[in-house]
Amino acid sequence: YHLIDAEMVSLDLHDRLEIAPGDSLTVVGPHGTETVGPDEDNLVRRALALAGRTASVTLHKQIPAGAGLGGGSADAAAVLRWAGFTDLRAAAALGADIAFCLVGGRARVTGIGEIVDPLPHDRRTFTIVTPPIFCSTPAVYRAWDEMGGPAGDNGNDLEPAALVVAPELVRWRDELADQTDRRPQLAGSGSTWFVEGAFPDVGRVVTTVPAYEWKRRGD
């Protein structure tokens, strides 16, 4: 495990889970099985095992996997909440942001993710860009360790390591910076970049990037 000190916030971007009696997992939607990974590795499966429950789950995947947005963690937290599971330390052992996803809102998260200190609500608008690049969180942390644990200069210490794992991220960062005249920040271990504000308006295209093949980095 790594010790973290992060500010986390809930977004109005979400997956949807249908839970019924049974023992199966089906992933559908625009960010389905081709990016989520093997069934046995899915955080929904692992959350069910942690809670000692079985269920038939249909996961409607809207949050890109490997984007640093905590989609898999939010799914796991939804299952744990359904099961009535409230042990934040055990939840954090599955993933560093799962305990936060159980609590939600806005918080400072420390330890291995099990210490969740709520912060005041702060309504803000962000523009996010999710490149078609899957950034493996374990791979980014490995790169960070191999680099000697460098500190980032823009609010996220994992950014230098993510750029080693997926150098293509630079192109997307620079394009967003050019279009917004702001320096983008990396979400989590990547691959999402974000800036504060709406450019030019909520729900509209910020910029068009030439066709780019979806890639998985750091398996």
Q: What does each model-found stretch correspond to?
A:
Residues Y1-A67, T130:
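ATP-binding N-lobe of GHMP and related small-molecule kinases
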Residues H2-E7, F85-Q185, E196-D219:
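ATP-dependent small-molecule kinase catalytic core of the GHMP/sugar-kinase superfamily
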Residues D5, R45, A77-L80, Y141:
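Predominant activation on well-ordered alpha-helical scaffold segments within soluble catalytic domains
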Residues V27, V44-A47, L80, A166, ...:
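Short, hydrophobic beta-strand segments that form beta-sheet elements in well-ordered domains
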Residues L43, D75, E168:
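Charged catalytic carboxylate motif
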Residues P64-G66, A99, S191-F194:
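Short, active-site-adjacent cap segments at secondary-structure transitions
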Residues A67-A92:
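DPxDG-like acidic metal-binding loop motif
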Residues G71-G72, L186-S191:
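Glycine-rich beta-strand-to-loop/alpha-helix junction loops that act as flexible
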